[in-house]
Amino acid sequence: MPEKLQLLLDRIKPASRSLSDAARAHLDDLTKPQGSLGRLEEIALKYVLATGNLSPLLSKKKICCFAADHGVAAEGVSAFPAEVTPQMVYNMLGGGAAINVLTRHAGVDLDVVDMGVNHDFPDLAGLVKRKVQPGSANMATGPAMSEEDALQALLCGAELAAEAQEAGYHLLGTGEMGIANTTPATALYAVLLDVSVESITGRGTGIDDERLLHKIAVIKQAIAVNGSRCTTPFATLAALGGYEIAAIAGFILGAAAARTPVVVDGFISSAGAVVALKLCPAVEDYLFFSHLSNEQGHRAVMEKLGARPILDLDLRLGEGTGAAIAMQLIEGAVKIYNEMATFSAARVSEKSGE
């Protein structure tokens, strides 16, 4: 384990279980039948415990959309060419992508982070330049990243989470952009969760049956080529991941270290979450999985993690779109907790005894 990574992991502590009884009692005292707001109450309770605050704040929200290219795109595993990655980054910076519309609607700030796009961007508003390399190497023929580069990307994600917490953000979210990135995400799931490649490989941006079979073969080849390197979760990330996935893992770890809840987007972001969970299981206390992706395999991944995503809307876009929508529900749940009257304060009669 790299020393800098171990120092980050050592800063992550489990959520404050000591507040659980008081928070539950408060939820039960609100002017409603106990438990009648269902998962909104569960979400509010988890948020309280994660923040360690019985009167939690939630007004400032931010999503970081991490972008990177992938050498494995050369294997023809995506329906779109690699040049779409920088094109979509420009679209986001111009405000025209789905994530822009949804973050504006939800009152969420958005940063687009260049972790490894094969393009030199000028200085633009909303763009955070943290490029490690101009794309990963082809994991079908060797490791996607060196361990040094993977560590740099991971620690960059952690730094961005810490900076956001210091800037007063209460809730963070992940997003990503990178042509072919369902391929490394699937490889990471197969190795880290011990599931078959066939069961979790999906169509990504819309590949046909023939290309799907090819994608499965490429992922299996990558795992075979890099199998001896996959001795730890971090080594597996370096061998089979990508710069945006490494940054997402670090972003989640950094958020947990700062006791800041983080909303995980879909199939790709969940791969970063799996890496983070394998490195430090305590981060689960700070995670909200935003939605069940329509991408094949995400349900199996969520079941393996024992996770229950907030939404099921057949989303498969990425970018942070599911996280932006889920943030509104989380904010609503926290407002219920903070702003509803209690039976005692409102002088509303409680349920009579049987």
From Swiss-Prot:
Domain of life: Bacteria
Database matches in Pfam families: DBI_PRT
InterPro entries: Nict_dMeBzImd_PRibTrfase, Nict_dMeBzImd_PRibTrfase_bact, Nict_dMeBzImd_PRibTrfase_N, Nict_dMeBzImd_PRibTrfase_sf
GO MF entries: nicotinate-nucleotide-dimethylbenzimidazole phosphoribosyltransferase activity
GO biological process terms, semicolon-separated: cobalamin biosynthetic process
Disulfide bonding pattern of the chain: none
Active site positions, chain numbering: E319 (proton acceptor)
Keyword Membrane set for record: no
UniProt keyword Glycosyltransferase, yes or no: yes
Pathway(s) of this molecule: Nucleoside biosynthesis; alpha-ribazole biosynthesis; alpha-ribazole from 5,6-dimethylbenzimidazole: step 1/2
Signal peptide range: none
Keywords: Cobalamin biosynthesis, Glycosyltransferase, Transferase
Annotated function: Catalyzes the synthesis of alpha-ribazole-5'-phosphate from nicotinate mononucleotide (NAMN) and 5,6-dimethylbenzimidazole (DMB).
NCBIfam families: cobT_DBIPRT, PRK00105.1
Family affiliation: Belongs to the CobT family.
Protein name: Nicotinate-nucleotide--dimethylbenzimidazole phosphoribosyltransferase
Annotated organism of origin: Pelodictyon phaeoclathratiforme (strain DSM 5477 / BU-1)
Lineage: Bacteria, Pseudomonadati, Chlorobiota, Chlorobiia, Chlorobiales
